[in-house]
Amino acid sequence: MNDPLRNFLDKIKPSFQGKGGLSYYFPIFDVIENLFYSSDKRTKGLTHVRDGSDIQRIMVVVWLATFPTMFAGMYNLGYQSLNAIEQLTLANTAFEKDWHWPLITFFTSLNPNSFMDCLVYGAIYFIPIYVVVFAVGIGCELIFALIRRHEVSEGAFVTTVLFALSCPPNAPLWQCALGIAVGLVIGKEIFGGTGKNFLNPALTGRAFLYFAYPASWSGDMSWVAVDGYTAATILGTAAQDGYQSLAYTWNNAFLGFIPGSIGETSTLAILVGLAILLYTKVASWRIVLGVAIGTIFTSYLFNIVGSETNPMFSMPFWWHMVIGGYAFGLVFMATEPVSGSHTNAGRWV
């Protein structure tokens, strides 16, 4: 089959290889080529065990597994925000309108009962975050690839989407850019790159921003994409007043109709991603089951001990599993193939 793009890349590839005039910039060519095509490198030798999977395919599987969470998160973000706008409008309460607003009014009718309006509203907030995080993340990878004279790791594609999904919808874009840069440089590159890091770069960047800019990454104004509107997360409310005081049902939390970071709200969507990871054997079922057993045991222990000052001691394990970042962290962070456990015993622990 005649493929113009493939022919063009094959034509210019020699210039980026060996003693070609552009060989220094081979990592840039490599990331563009691998973005559209599978790697043409094949291991040869009679003693090598061959498998149908490689790093590129594994990372693509993880990336695709985030899609249910991504779309559910965008829809819920729009649903929460459009309901908030409706409440403010009925109460004749003014709210700030930032640069997102012209796009929102152009592409939506501000109807919280419209599936497409909710999805598009959420996309208007999430896509800029993802684009900025992706561009800065790949930029950091390219810089280190050029310095070290090696190929760009496909792991950056997964790190950027996981980091973007962990962001609050109102997070400033420059802070998102700073966070992914810190996560990749401090969490991975200073240890030598993919396969040598013991920290999860997405979590490293998220933790840095949580402590460096707490006003933007915690509190009550970060979770619904309406400037000036306050809404506590379900975990924050439960920690302060107990889970019995929640305005949301367990089903609301499981399906994802609650405020929160873009990727953490829908446990159902996250479980769809988990099914993909387990079916393709990218994730270890031992890690998933080990964390679940540990959660149940620890939760029952706190239930037995009890506390008059900390309402979280009384929360049953099934609530722990559907609020906060528990499900997202379990499925996409704990099972991460580089920083996660590699031995079967370690996966249980």
Predicted regions and their residues:
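Hydrophobic alpha-helical bundle architecture
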Residues: 165-168, 273-286, 299-349
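A generic, well-ordered mixed alpha/beta core segment in the N-terminal half of proteins
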Residues: 142, 153-223
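Structural signature of hydrophobic alpha-helical transmembrane segments
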Residues: 119-133, 170-179, 253-267, 313-326
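C-terminal ends of transmembrane helices
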Residues: 43-49, 136-149, 185-195, 272-281, ...
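Alpha-helical transmembrane segments in multi-pass membrane proteins
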Residues: 61-72, 128-141, 156-160, 164, ...
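N-terminal signal-anchor module of multipass membrane proteins
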Residues: 1-126, 130
